[in-house]
Amino acid sequence: MRCPHCHKNGSRVVDSRPSEDGSFIRRRRECIHCGFRFTTFERYEETPLLVIKKDGTRQEFSRQKILNGIVRSAEKRPVSMERLTKIADKVEKQIRSIGESEVSSQIIGKFVMNELKGVDEIAYIRFASVYRQFKDVDAFMSELETMMKAEHKK
Protein backbone atom coordinates (compact mmCIF):
# COMPACT_ATOMS: atom_id res chain seq x y z
CA MET A 1 0.00 0.00 0.00
CA ARG A 2 1.26 3.47 -0.85
CA CYS A 3 2.15 5.69 2.12
CA PRO A 4 0.12 8.93 2.22
CA HIS A 5 3.16 10.72 3.69
CA CYS A 6 6.19 9.68 1.54
CA HIS A 7 4.16 8.14 -1.34
CA LYS A 8 6.33 5.01 -1.50
CA ASN A 9 4.88 1.52 -1.75
CA GLY A 10 5.32 -0.76 1.22
CA SER A 11 3.67 -0.90 4.60
CA ARG A 12 3.11 -3.42 7.34
CA VAL A 13 -0.08 -4.01 9.29
CA VAL A 14 0.28 -3.02 12.95
CA ASP A 15 -3.30 -3.73 14.07
CA SER A 16 -6.51 -5.16 12.50
CA ARG A 17 -10.03 -4.92 13.88
CA PRO A 18 -13.39 -5.78 12.36
CA SER A 19 -16.18 -3.19 12.59
CA GLU A 20 -19.06 -3.81 15.00
CA ASP A 21 -21.32 -5.11 12.24
CA GLY A 22 -18.50 -6.96 10.48
CA SER A 23 -18.96 -5.06 7.21
CA PHE A 24 -15.39 -3.76 7.06
CA ILE A 25 -11.96 -4.17 8.65
CA ARG A 26 -9.99 -1.27 10.15
CA ARG A 27 -6.24 -1.66 9.77
CA ARG A 28 -3.44 0.43 11.31
CA ARG A 29 -0.46 0.42 9.00
CA GLU A 30 3.11 1.63 9.24
CA CYS A 31 5.22 2.68 6.24
CA ILE A 32 8.39 0.58 6.02
CA HIS A 33 10.26 3.54 4.50
CA CYS A 34 9.44 6.55 6.70
CA GLY A 35 7.66 4.98 9.71
CA PHE A 36 4.47 7.06 9.20
CA ARG A 37 1.36 5.38 10.65
CA PHE A 38 -2.02 5.55 8.93
CA THR A 39 -5.41 3.83 8.97
CA THR A 40 -7.16 2.00 6.14
CA PHE A 41 -10.64 0.53 5.93
CA GLU A 42 -11.25 -2.58 3.85
CA ARG A 43 -14.60 -3.81 2.58
CA TYR A 44 -15.23 -7.00 0.71
CA GLU A 45 -16.32 -6.51 -2.87
CA GLU A 46 -19.81 -7.82 -3.48
CA THR A 47 -20.52 -9.59 -6.72
CA PRO A 48 -22.90 -7.63 -8.92
CA LEU A 49 -26.49 -8.72 -8.52
CA LEU A 50 -28.94 -8.44 -11.40
CA VAL A 51 -32.71 -8.19 -11.07
CA ILE A 52 -34.83 -9.90 -13.72
CA LYS A 53 -37.81 -7.62 -14.35
CA LYS A 54 -41.29 -8.85 -15.35
CA ASP A 55 -40.58 -8.07 -19.01
CA GLY A 56 -37.39 -10.16 -18.91
CA THR A 57 -34.95 -7.26 -18.93
CA ARG A 58 -32.10 -7.25 -16.44
CA GLN A 59 -31.15 -4.35 -14.22
CA GLU A 60 -28.48 -3.94 -11.56
CA PHE A 61 -29.84 -4.44 -8.04
CA SER A 62 -30.48 -1.22 -6.15
CA ARG A 63 -31.11 -1.24 -2.41
CA GLN A 64 -32.17 2.40 -2.75
CA LYS A 65 -35.05 1.40 -5.07
CA ILE A 66 -36.30 -1.03 -2.45
CA LEU A 67 -36.03 1.60 0.27
CA ASN A 68 -37.85 4.17 -1.89
CA GLY A 69 -40.73 1.74 -2.45
CA ILE A 70 -40.95 0.90 1.25
CA VAL A 71 -40.85 4.58 2.24
CA ARG A 72 -43.56 5.43 -0.30
CA SER A 73 -45.81 2.63 0.98
CA ALA A 74 -45.35 3.75 4.61
CA GLU A 75 -45.96 7.44 3.89
CA LYS A 76 -47.95 9.13 6.70
CA ARG A 77 -47.82 5.94 8.77
CA PRO A 78 -46.33 5.65 12.27
CA VAL A 79 -43.23 3.79 11.10
CA SER A 80 -39.81 5.33 11.71
CA MET A 81 -37.27 5.80 8.95
CA GLU A 82 -34.88 3.67 11.01
CA ARG A 83 -37.38 0.79 10.92
CA LEU A 84 -37.87 1.17 7.16
CA THR A 85 -34.11 1.17 6.62
CA LYS A 86 -33.81 -2.02 8.68
CA ILE A 87 -36.47 -3.63 6.48
CA ALA A 88 -34.49 -2.70 3.35
CA ASP A 89 -31.31 -4.07 4.97
CA LYS A 90 -33.03 -7.33 5.88
CA VAL A 91 -34.50 -7.73 2.40
CA GLU A 92 -31.10 -7.12 0.80
CA LYS A 93 -29.53 -9.69 3.14
CA GLN A 94 -32.23 -12.24 2.19
CA ILE A 95 -31.66 -11.61 -1.51
CA ARG A 96 -27.88 -11.96 -1.23
CA SER A 97 -28.22 -15.11 0.90
CA ILE A 98 -29.88 -16.84 -2.06
CA GLY A 99 -26.40 -16.95 -3.54
CA GLU A 100 -27.43 -16.34 -7.14
CA SER A 101 -26.10 -13.62 -9.44
CA GLU A 102 -29.63 -12.97 -10.73
CA VAL A 103 -32.91 -12.73 -8.83
CA SER A 104 -36.43 -12.04 -10.08
CA SER A 105 -38.30 -8.91 -9.09
CA GLN A 106 -41.16 -11.17 -7.91
CA ILE A 107 -38.93 -12.72 -5.24
CA ILE A 108 -37.79 -9.29 -4.09
CA GLY A 109 -41.41 -8.12 -3.90
CA LYS A 110 -42.38 -11.15 -1.80
CA PHE A 111 -39.51 -10.51 0.63
CA VAL A 112 -40.58 -6.85 1.01
CA MET A 113 -44.24 -7.79 1.50
CA ASN A 114 -43.33 -10.37 4.17
CA GLU A 115 -41.40 -7.75 6.12
CA LEU A 116 -44.04 -5.02 5.76
CA LYS A 117 -46.85 -7.35 6.81
CA GLY A 118 -45.34 -7.65 10.28
CA VAL A 119 -44.69 -3.92 10.64
CA ASP A 120 -47.69 -2.03 9.24
CA GLU A 121 -50.69 -3.55 7.46
CA ILE A 122 -51.56 -0.35 5.60
CA ALA A 123 -48.02 -0.07 4.25
CA TYR A 124 -48.27 -3.74 3.28
CA ILE A 125 -51.52 -3.19 1.35
CA ARG A 126 -50.11 -0.11 -0.37
CA PHE A 127 -46.98 -2.00 -1.42
CA ALA A 128 -48.99 -5.06 -2.49
CA SER A 129 -51.33 -2.93 -4.63
CA VAL A 130 -48.36 -1.66 -6.66
CA TYR A 131 -46.37 -4.91 -6.63
CA ARG A 132 -49.24 -7.22 -7.53
CA GLN A 133 -50.92 -4.71 -9.86
CA PHE A 134 -54.45 -5.74 -8.90
CA LYS A 135 -56.61 -5.90 -12.03
CA ASP A 136 -59.79 -4.83 -10.28
CA VAL A 137 -61.40 -4.11 -6.93
CA ASP A 138 -62.33 -7.78 -6.46
CA ALA A 139 -58.68 -8.87 -6.56
CA PHE A 140 -57.82 -6.12 -4.09
CA MET A 141 -60.69 -7.12 -1.77
CA SER A 142 -59.62 -10.76 -1.96
CA GLU A 143 -56.16 -9.80 -0.66
CA LEU A 144 -57.75 -7.74 2.14
CA GLU A 145 -60.01 -10.63 3.13
CA THR A 146 -57.06 -13.04 3.23
CA MET A 147 -55.21 -10.64 5.46
CA MET A 148 -58.22 -10.11 7.75
CA LYS A 149 -58.74 -13.88 8.13
CA ALA A 150 -55.10 -14.30 9.12
CA GLU A 151 -55.50 -11.47 11.64
CA HIS A 152 -58.57 -13.08 13.24
CA LYS A 153 -56.70 -16.38 13.71
CA LYS A 154 -54.18 -14.63 15.99
Swiss-Prot record:
| The species this protein was found in | Limosilactobacillus reuteri (strain DSM 20016)
Q: Which residues form the ATP-cone domain?
A: 49-139
Q: Which UniProt keywords apply?
A: ATP-binding, DNA-binding, Metal-binding, Nucleotide-binding, Repressor, Transcription, Transcription regulation, Zinc, Zinc-finger
Cofactor note (record): Binds 1 zinc ion.
Q: Which family is it part of?
A: Belongs to the NrdR family.
GO biological-process terms attached to the record: negative regulation of DNA-templated transcription
Zn fingers (unnamed): where?
A: 3-34
Which InterPro entries does UniProt cross-reference here? ATP-cone_dom, NrdR-like_N, RNR_NrdR-like
Q: What is the lineage of its organism?
A: Bacteria, Bacillati, Bacillota, Bacilli, Lactobacillales
What are the required cofactors?
Zn(2+)
UniProt protein name: Transcriptional repressor NrdR
Disulfide bridges in this chain: none
Q: What does this protein do?
A: Negatively regulates transcription of bacterial ribonucleotide reductase nrd genes and operons by binding to NrdR-boxes.
Q: Molecular function (GO) terms listed? A: ATP binding; DNA binding; zinc ion binding
